[in-house]
Regions:
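Short hydrophobic beta-strand that contains or immediately precedes a catalytic carboxylate
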Residues: 5-8
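Mature soluble extracellular domains of secreted precursor proteins
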Residues: 30-38
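C-terminal accessory helical subdomains adjacent to catalytic cores in phosphodiester-
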Residues: 2, 13-14, 18-29, 43-199
Length: 199
Protein backbone atom coordinates (compact mmCIF):
# COMPACT_ATOMS: atom_id res chain seq x y z
CA UNK A 1 0.00 0.00 0.00
CA UNK A 2 1.25 3.49 -0.85
CA UNK A 3 1.93 5.89 2.02
CA UNK A 4 2.37 9.63 2.42
CA UNK A 5 4.48 11.11 5.22
CA UNK A 6 3.82 14.78 5.99
CA UNK A 7 6.65 16.42 7.94
CA UNK A 8 7.97 19.79 9.04
CA UNK A 9 11.26 20.08 7.19
CA UNK A 10 14.07 18.71 5.07
CA UNK A 11 15.77 16.95 7.97
CA UNK A 12 12.61 14.93 8.57
CA UNK A 13 12.62 13.82 4.93
CA UNK A 14 16.29 12.87 5.23
CA UNK A 15 15.51 10.88 8.40
CA UNK A 16 12.81 8.85 6.64
CA UNK A 17 15.00 8.23 3.59
CA UNK A 18 17.91 7.10 5.77
CA UNK A 19 15.61 4.89 7.86
CA UNK A 20 14.65 2.80 4.84
CA UNK A 21 18.22 2.72 3.57
CA UNK A 22 19.46 1.58 6.99
CA UNK A 23 16.99 -1.27 7.38
CA UNK A 24 17.66 -2.49 3.85
CA UNK A 25 14.09 -2.35 2.59
CA UNK A 26 13.61 -1.77 -1.11
CA UNK A 27 11.14 1.11 -0.87
CA UNK A 28 10.88 3.59 -3.73
CA UNK A 29 10.68 7.06 -2.16
CA UNK A 30 9.60 10.30 -3.81
CA UNK A 31 10.01 13.64 -2.01
CA UNK A 32 8.48 17.10 -2.08
CA UNK A 33 9.97 20.13 -0.30
CA UNK A 34 7.54 23.05 -0.11
CA UNK A 35 10.41 25.38 0.83
CA UNK A 36 11.98 24.80 -2.59
CA UNK A 37 8.88 25.96 -4.49
CA UNK A 38 7.85 29.57 -5.09
CA UNK A 39 5.15 30.57 -2.58
CA UNK A 40 2.39 31.02 -5.17
CA UNK A 41 3.15 27.68 -6.84
CA UNK A 42 3.19 25.37 -3.79
CA UNK A 43 -0.48 24.37 -3.84
CA UNK A 44 -0.52 23.51 -7.56
CA UNK A 45 2.75 21.57 -7.48
CA UNK A 46 1.71 19.78 -4.29
CA UNK A 47 -1.63 18.75 -5.82
CA UNK A 48 0.07 17.46 -8.98
CA UNK A 49 2.67 15.57 -6.93
CA UNK A 50 -0.01 13.80 -4.85
CA UNK A 51 -2.18 13.02 -7.89
CA UNK A 52 0.82 11.63 -9.77
CA UNK A 53 1.86 9.59 -6.72
CA UNK A 54 -1.60 8.03 -6.48
CA UNK A 55 -1.64 6.84 -10.10
CA UNK A 56 -1.42 3.08 -10.48
CA UNK A 57 1.59 3.29 -12.82
CA UNK A 58 3.56 5.53 -10.46
CA UNK A 59 6.62 3.53 -9.30
CA UNK A 60 6.91 5.08 -5.83
CA UNK A 61 5.80 3.38 -2.62
CA UNK A 62 6.25 6.37 -0.33
CA UNK A 63 5.88 10.13 -0.75
CA UNK A 64 7.66 12.14 1.95
CA UNK A 65 6.73 15.84 2.06
CA UNK A 66 8.33 18.64 4.03
CA UNK A 67 6.00 21.57 4.51
CA UNK A 68 8.51 24.25 5.51
CA UNK A 69 7.80 24.40 9.24
CA UNK A 70 5.27 23.39 11.86
CA UNK A 71 2.66 26.13 11.24
CA UNK A 72 2.47 25.19 7.55
CA UNK A 73 2.49 21.47 8.37
CA UNK A 74 -0.50 21.84 10.72
CA UNK A 75 -2.38 24.04 8.26
CA UNK A 76 -1.77 21.74 5.29
CA UNK A 77 -2.45 18.60 7.33
CA UNK A 78 -5.87 19.84 8.42
CA UNK A 79 -6.74 20.85 4.85
CA UNK A 80 -5.54 17.60 3.24
CA UNK A 81 -6.71 15.05 5.82
CA UNK A 82 -10.22 14.78 4.42
CA UNK A 83 -9.20 14.11 0.82
CA UNK A 84 -6.21 11.96 1.74
CA UNK A 85 -8.19 9.80 4.15
CA UNK A 86 -10.68 8.93 1.39
CA UNK A 87 -7.93 7.23 -0.63
CA UNK A 88 -6.60 3.75 -0.11
CA UNK A 89 -3.19 4.51 1.33
CA UNK A 90 -1.32 4.89 4.58
CA UNK A 91 -0.81 8.30 6.06
CA UNK A 92 1.83 9.42 8.61
CA UNK A 93 2.26 12.76 10.39
CA UNK A 94 5.89 13.37 11.50
CA UNK A 95 6.02 16.35 13.85
CA UNK A 96 7.89 17.96 16.78
CA UNK A 97 5.98 18.47 20.04
CA UNK A 98 8.35 21.15 21.41
CA UNK A 99 7.93 19.70 24.94
CA UNK A 100 4.12 19.85 24.79
CA UNK A 101 2.03 16.77 25.57
CA UNK A 102 0.81 14.66 22.66
CA UNK A 103 -2.76 15.31 23.78
CA UNK A 104 -2.25 19.05 23.17
CA UNK A 105 -1.30 18.32 19.54
CA UNK A 106 -4.44 16.23 19.03
CA UNK A 107 -6.60 18.90 20.68
CA UNK A 108 -5.16 21.54 18.34
CA UNK A 109 -5.53 19.40 15.20
CA UNK A 110 -9.06 18.43 16.19
CA UNK A 111 -10.00 22.09 16.64
CA UNK A 112 -8.46 23.04 13.27
CA UNK A 113 -10.10 20.21 11.31
CA UNK A 114 -13.51 21.03 12.79
CA UNK A 115 -13.13 24.59 11.52
CA UNK A 116 -12.04 23.59 8.02
CA UNK A 117 -15.20 21.91 6.77
CA UNK A 118 -18.24 24.12 7.17
CA UNK A 119 -21.50 22.25 7.16
CA UNK A 120 -19.92 18.95 8.21
CA UNK A 121 -18.50 18.01 11.56
CA UNK A 122 -15.20 16.13 11.61
CA UNK A 123 -12.80 15.22 14.35
CA UNK A 124 -9.40 13.76 15.10
CA UNK A 125 -8.51 11.69 18.13
CA UNK A 126 -5.68 9.46 19.27
CA UNK A 127 -6.79 5.83 19.43
CA UNK A 128 -3.62 4.12 20.63
CA UNK A 129 -0.14 4.99 21.80
CA UNK A 130 1.95 2.42 19.92
CA UNK A 131 5.18 3.18 21.74
CA UNK A 132 7.13 5.81 23.58
CA UNK A 133 10.81 6.27 24.27
CA UNK A 134 13.06 9.04 25.50
CA UNK A 135 12.84 11.20 22.38
CA UNK A 136 9.82 10.06 20.36
CA UNK A 137 6.23 8.84 20.58
CA UNK A 138 4.48 6.62 18.04
CA UNK A 139 0.68 6.70 17.99
CA UNK A 140 -2.32 5.73 15.91
CA UNK A 141 -5.08 8.26 15.37
CA UNK A 142 -8.48 8.45 13.76
CA UNK A 143 -9.99 11.05 11.43
CA UNK A 144 -13.78 10.74 11.57
CA UNK A 145 -17.07 12.32 10.63
CA UNK A 146 -19.23 12.95 13.67
CA UNK A 147 -22.15 11.25 11.88
CA UNK A 148 -19.93 8.12 11.49
CA UNK A 149 -20.04 8.21 7.68
CA UNK A 150 -16.26 8.59 7.33
CA UNK A 151 -13.45 7.11 9.37
CA UNK A 152 -9.81 6.67 8.52
CA UNK A 153 -6.82 5.86 10.67
CA UNK A 154 -3.40 7.45 10.36
CA UNK A 155 -0.13 7.24 12.27
CA UNK A 156 1.85 9.87 14.14
CA UNK A 157 5.56 10.00 14.90
CA UNK A 158 6.12 12.86 17.34
CA UNK A 159 9.49 13.95 18.65
CA UNK A 160 8.96 15.03 22.27
CA UNK A 161 11.11 18.12 21.78
CA UNK A 162 12.33 18.04 18.18
CA UNK A 163 14.45 16.02 15.77
CA UNK A 164 17.43 18.31 16.28
CA UNK A 165 17.40 17.76 20.06
CA UNK A 166 17.08 13.98 19.63
CA UNK A 167 20.02 13.94 17.19
CA UNK A 168 22.13 16.36 19.24
CA UNK A 169 22.29 18.96 16.47
CA UNK A 170 23.31 22.19 18.22
CA UNK A 171 22.08 24.75 15.70
CA UNK A 172 18.99 25.00 13.48
CA UNK A 173 21.33 25.85 10.59
CA UNK A 174 23.59 22.82 11.14
CA UNK A 175 23.09 20.14 8.47
CA UNK A 176 24.83 17.35 10.36
CA UNK A 177 23.46 14.31 8.53
CA UNK A 178 25.79 11.99 10.46
CA UNK A 179 24.02 12.81 13.74
CA UNK A 180 20.64 12.04 12.18
CA UNK A 181 22.03 8.73 10.94
CA UNK A 182 23.14 7.92 14.50
CA UNK A 183 19.47 8.02 15.53
CA UNK A 184 18.91 5.01 13.30
CA UNK A 185 21.39 2.54 14.78
CA UNK A 186 20.02 -0.97 15.18
CA UNK A 187 18.94 -0.62 18.82
CA UNK A 188 17.98 3.05 18.98
CA UNK A 189 14.66 4.11 20.46
CA UNK A 190 13.88 6.36 17.48
CA UNK A 191 14.42 3.48 15.05
CA UNK A 192 12.14 1.18 17.10
CA UNK A 193 9.29 3.69 17.01
CA UNK A 194 9.81 4.36 13.30
CA UNK A 195 9.71 0.61 12.64
CA UNK A 196 6.42 0.36 14.55
CA UNK A 197 4.83 2.99 12.32
CA UNK A 198 6.57 2.73 8.94
CA UNK A 199 6.92 -1.04 8.52
Amino acid sequence: MKRIVLSEGKRDVFLVEQFFERIGRNVEIDTFHASEVAKGEVKGQETRKIQNFMERRNPYDLLVKSEGGKPDLKRIFTKLIRSLSAREMGFVLLIDLDNRPLSALFDELNQKVRGNYDGNEYGIEMTEKIGEDTDIIAAEALFFAVDDSTTSSFDVLAFKKDLEHAAGIPSPDDTDEERINELLTEYSSVRRQMEAVLL
